[in-house]
C-alpha cells in the first residue's frame, strides 16, 4: 500500500467518510488494489447495511515521491449529514497516523469526532 494525495477534494465524515469537491483542499489516502468482487462486497455493504451509495470516479493521485498515477475513488453524491461515530472516526485516524499522513490532515480527521464537533461548529 502506498500513501497518495488527491487535489481538489476535502474529506468529510458525516457520518461516514466521503470526499467533497473543492478548489482549496487536498485529501490523503492509501492506494490499494482490490478485485471486482471485493469492491462489490464493500459497496454492497455500504448500500444495504449503512444506507449509502458510493459511485466510482477515475482520478489522478500524487504519491509522496511526486509521481502521478491514475486511480479510482468512490464518492457518495447524497449523504444525509449526521454526527460521525467516535469508533468510526478512529478507524480512519489510526491508519492515517500509522501511514504517516501529515499532522494537519490527522487533525482534520479528528475534527469529526463527536467530542470535537461543538468546536467545529463554533
PLM region descriptions:
Residues 1-122:
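Glycine-aromatic micro-motifs
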Amino acid at each position: 500500500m502506498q500513501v497518495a494525495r488527491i487535489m481538489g477534494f476535502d474529506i468529510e465524515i458525516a457520518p461516514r467518510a466521503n470526499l467533497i469537491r473543492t478548489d482549496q483542499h487536498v485529501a490523503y489516502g492509501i492506494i490499494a488494489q482490490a478485485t471486482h468482487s471485493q469492491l462489490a462486497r464493500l459497496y454492497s455493504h455500504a448500500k444495504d447495511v449503512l444506507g449509502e451509495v458510493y459511485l466510482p470516479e477515475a482520478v489522478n493521485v500524487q504519491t509522496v515521491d511526486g509521481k502521478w498515477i491514475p486511480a479510482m475513488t468512490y464518492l457518495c453524491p447524497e449523504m444525509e449529514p449526521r454526527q460521525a461515530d467516535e469508533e468510526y472516526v478512529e478507524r480512519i485516524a489510526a491508519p492515517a497516523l500509522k501511514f504517516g499522513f501529515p499532522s494537519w490532515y490527522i487533525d482534520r480527521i479528528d475534527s469529526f469526532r463527536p467530542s470535537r464537533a461543538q468546536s467545529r461548529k463554533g
